[in-house]
UniProtKB/Swiss-Prot annotation:
Keywords: Cytoplasm, Metal-binding, Nucleus, Transferase, Ubl conjugation pathway, Wnt signaling pathway, Zinc, Zinc-finger
UniProt zinc finger (RING-type) residues: 36-74
Gene (name only): rnf146
Gene Ontology CC: cytoplasm; cytosol; nucleus
Metabolic or biological pathway, per its Swiss-Prot or TrEMBL entry: Protein modification; protein ubiquitination
Organism: Xenopus laevis (African clawed frog)
Catalytic reactions of this protein: S-ubiquitinyl-[E2 ubiquitin-conjugating enzyme]-L-cysteine + [acceptor protein]-L-lysine = [E2 ubiquitin-conjugating enzyme]-L-cysteine + N(6)-ubiquitinyl-[acceptor protein]-L-lysine
Cited PROSITE patterns: WWE, ZF_RING_1, ZF_RING_2
Stated role: E3 ubiquitin-protein ligase that specifically binds poly-ADP-ribosylated proteins and mediates their ubiquitination and subsequent degradation. May regulate many important biological processes, such as cell survival and DNA damage response. Acts as an activator of the Wnt signaling pathway by mediating the ubiquitination of poly-ADP-ribosylated proteins. Neuroprotective protein. Protects against cell death induced by DNA damaging agents and rescues cells from G1 arrest. Promotes cell survival after gamma-irradiation. Facilitates DNA repair.
Binding site for a glycoprotein: 107, 110, 114, 144, 153, 163, 175
Descriptive protein name: E3 ubiquitin-protein ligase rnf146
Primary location group: cytoplasm
Free-text domain note: The WWE domain mediates non-covalent poly(ADP-ribose)-binding.
InterPro entries noted in UniProt: RING-HC_RNF146, RNF146, WWE-dom_subgr, WWE_dom, WWE_dom_sf, Znf_C3HC4_RING-type, Znf_RING, Znf_RING/FYVE/PHD
Amino acid sequence: MAGCGEVSHSANMLPTNKKLDEPCSNNAPSLSVPECAICLQICVHPVSLPCKHIFCYLCVKGASWLGRRCALCRQEIPEDFLDKPTLLSPEDLKSASRGNGEYAWYYEGRNGWWQYDERTSRELEDAFTKGKKSTEMLIAGFLYVADLENMVQYRRNEHGRRRKIKRDIVDIPKKGVAGLRLECDAANLNLARESSADGADSMAALGDSSSQPAHVLPARLHTSLSTTTSQVLSHSDVTTSLENSFTQLQIGDPVINRNYIGEEGRPLIIARMQATNAVLEEQEPSDRNDHGSPALQHNSFLVPQSNRLPFGNP
């Protein structure tokens, strides 16, 4: 880089009254609005990156689509910078939303209308007043065509996606200017982001799901985890009663069933019951009440009257 007083290609850029051998002055007046190194024009809604380089907001937006890096130093741009940019003059955004004239130009958004930036609005208004059918606009590094007859815009090399445009008064409700939200919309946007970032939305979803009835676990898992001792005992009692029922119905080995018939052609169990009754009659009444009755009741329970085998030969 050539220093002061050295001949270089930038010598022609010096003022005519400035000599090459004069020392450089550091008190040169600085521009109130910086120039953008991307579009090479005066910055429109200038923003400052973390690396302190300044560009147009739309120029940074277009460059971030190609790669999230500064166009000068290649430092990485934060992911949320486009949502929360650092504006050099936020007051300019408010004045731009109020407009300089009676009418302004808008393009259609997802849930409302966006106002064009001041430079693009001047180009559209100039083409409209001159009666042109279309005009070209450079927005965020892409060349767009504004069809003033059908009031739509599209990229010059991509006609598939079209967006409506309109010329309307300045005071209509709008989302913002050139992708920059106004304060009311930005507050709602930040609130929505905070709700999704701190887990409030997910917690609310969990709260809604907790009000729904819980899924029933399988029967076997429920029994193994929450069965009490009394339930286990009742289960064993049921099993015992089933076995007794099978015994009463004489479901078992057929060889055992054949042994129920005695030698005299009477059922063997009945003969034993008669012998037991004879013994009980010889005992004292107290003994009969203490011992005989339970035995008799037990035998009667084992072989009901309805299940006795008929008399006959085996």
